[in-house]
Amino acid sequence: MTGVQTCALPISKYSPLSFRHFILGSVAIFVYVGVEVGVPNVLQKWLQNPELNVLGSGVNVEAIAGSVAATYWLLMLVGRLLGAMIGSKVSAKSMLMVVSSAGLLLTLGAMFAPNVPVNLPVFNGAEGFGLVNVPVSAALLVLVGLCTSVMWGGIFNLAVEGLGKYTEKASGIFMALVCGGGILPLLQNGIVDLTGGVGYLTSYWVIVAGLAYMLYYALIGSKNVNKDIPVRSEERRVGKE
């Protein structure tokens, strides 16, 4: 009687870390989560700092600062919905390039904008939408939420492109690197402390560096230069009597 036995090939000497664009993409994910968390985290602390009195007197500083930060997260949700609608029409590379550039411009604008007050529509969970008076820098940082909303998907798609059978392991590595959300804000807060508690906007150089790296990844770092590595899952079929 003749049968067919499936024999797995030897364990590959390669892994997701054998691909340069995946390694750079992993760094981009680490940086991205830090940017995503760091922008509203430091923004809220800046607005509610009693010594700086950014929002002025006679207002509920903590409530306003919280609603401004909440609006950032709301814009992230809006951005993801918009990203889902246009994602099939725009390449991951183009989308990441555009939102990284926009995020850079908004952040730099916030850092160097004059101290001019503007009315910002904000979301308050208890009262719905309303207008609050904040510095123009705060409004620009809130808009960064639209940019960060679609970065995860863009980075992931670029980083796993061409990985084939290594994609599953790559996903696990990505999930481990969300720790960037705790490290970059820590760096920002360290800068604030070093400046005597007044350098909140100065700390956004950390965010600028992160966004610049993601722009680099979209333009250059995402190119797969390891196409010689076999990525197909194969099995040998061995006949036996």
Kindly give the residue locations of the regions a language model identified.
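Short, small-residue-biased leader/transition segments that mark boundaries at the very start
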Residues: 2-9, 239-241
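Extracytoplasmic gate region of multi-pass secondary transporters
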Residues: 18-69
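Helix-to-loop junctions at the C-terminal end of transmembrane segments
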Residues: 79-92, 192
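C-terminal ends and interior cores of transmembrane alpha-helices
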Residues: 102-130
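Intracellular juxtamembrane helix-capping segments at the cytosolic ends
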Residues: 149-164
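A late C-terminal transmembrane helix in Major Facilitator Superfamily
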Residues: 162-195
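A membrane-interface helix-boundary motif in multi-pass transporters
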Residues: 187-210
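Multi-pass alpha-helical transporter architecture, strongest
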Residues: 205-233, 237
